[in-house]
Each structure stands twice: as structure tokens, then as C-alpha cells.
Amino acid sequence: MARYLGPKAKLARREGTDLFLKSARRALSDKCRLDNKPGQDGRTSGSRTSDYGNQLREKQKVKRIYGVLERQFRRYFAEAERRKGNTGETLLQLLESRLDNVVYRMGFGSTRAEARQLVSHCAILLNGNPVNIPSIQVKPGDVVAIREKAKKQARITESLNLVGQMAAVTWVSVDVAKLEGTFKQVPDREDISGEINESLIVELYSR
């Protein structure tokens, strides 16, 4: 399955919520009616979505938020199921601990896609070493930094300025002057978006 390269607003409308695929400088406009699915043109459907349909939609939504493909997502779920604790919560923690997501949470990328691109282009250091694998799992205490040759990129400065206007997450710390941050801890469930119902995903894979 290839990555979706079409309009981001269309995906947000399909899932009925902002997937944070667009940066704050190009946020979803008022014209993007999230309560209207693509092709509805304002009309509502008389059919109800089945339990399976709701579960599938929730999985698709989370995959799109984190930019993960189906095979990868299944591996994350299998790993979450293998570990002790709440499977759904562990799944989200694994996704939040991806390097591209941590780069995004630290404000170095205005979207996860932009953060993923920074990693793929070797613009990121992990504990002082250059890396280019977005899916690397970051551990508590790990230091993520912008490589010297990438520090002058305007998009990084713009992204940090935008993040400064929003509430920062508490489980990472960022030194803006040094363009580096520390992954302090794996986030608790309450630190992760409440727009996700991970129990539906667990139900889907338990069928």
C-alpha cells in the first residue's frame, strides 16, 4: 500500500476530525466541513455505520494521524499485545515514541510528514548519531537534535515559532537555542489526543 499523496482536507473529512496533517500556518479552513464526508455535498446518509465499520474507521484514522501503513500498524499492534498492560494504550505509546513523531512533538517539524522528511533526509541526530529511519523507537533520556548543516532551514525556525504559540507536551523538553530536545518519558494516556478511541482498534483485531 503506497502513501496517500492527495488532498489532506479530504482525509480529515473522511474521518470527521482534524488529523493534524496540515501545519498551523496552513490549517484547515472553515470551508472544510469535517461533518461532511467526501462526496456528500452536505447531504446526510440514512444508513448507520456498523460496529465493524466504526472499528475500521478508527484504525484508518490512527494510521493516517501517524502516517503508518497497514503492515507496520499490524506489527505495532502485535508488539502492544505482547507487552503487559493495556493493549490500546501501549499501541498509542509505541506510535508516540516513533522518532518522526518525537521530532514533531518537539516542534522541529510543523507536521508529522515534515518531521518524517527531516529524519529521512538525515537532518536529525539521535544521541549524537545521524539517523534516517523515522520508525526508530525513542527511549526515555534519548536526545534528539538538528544536525549542524540543517540548522539554517527556514521551515525548522517557522515550526518552532508556531509551537511557541501552542501548548507544549510535557513529556519532551526542548532547548530552542541548541535546537535539541530530550525525550523525558513515555507519555501517559491522558497526554495523548482524546480524539482517539483505541478500544475500537483492539476490538477490531480481536474479531
Swiss-Prot record:
- Region spans: Disordered: 31-56
Tell me which domain of life the UniProt entry assigns to the organism this sequence originates from.
Bacteria
KW Ribosomal protein (keyword) present: yes
Give the Polar residues compositional bias ranges. Answer: 42-53
Single Gene Ontology BP term? translation
**What keywords appear on the UniProt entry?**
Ribonucleoprotein, Ribosomal protein, RNA-binding, rRNA-binding
Q: Does the keyword S-adenosyl-L-methionine apply?
A: no
| SUPFAM superfamilies recorded | Alpha-L RNA-binding motif (SSF55174)
The cellular component terms of Gene Ontology attached to this UniProt record, alphabetical and capped at eight, are: small ribosomal subunit
GO MF annotation list: rRNA binding; structural constituent of ribosome
The record's section on Pfam families has: Ribosomal_S4, S4
Q: Where is the S4 RNA-binding domain?
A: 97-158
Regions of compositional bias (Basic and acidic residues) in chain numbering? 31-40
Q: How does it assemble?
A: Part of the 30S ribosomal subunit. Contacts protein S5. The interaction surface between S4 and S5 is involved in control of translational fidelity.
Q: PANTHER family from the entry?
A: 30S 40S RIBOSOMAL PROTEIN, SMALL RIBOSOMAL SUBUNIT PROTEIN US4M
Q: Which family does it belong to?
A: Belongs to the universal ribosomal protein uS4 family.
The function of this protein is: One of the primary rRNA binding proteins, it binds directly to 16S rRNA where it nucleates assembly of the body of the 30S subunit. With S5 and S12 plays an important role in translational accuracy.
Protein name stated in the entry: Small ribosomal subunit protein uS4
- What species was this sequence derived from? Polynucleobacter necessarius subsp. necessarius (strain STIR1)
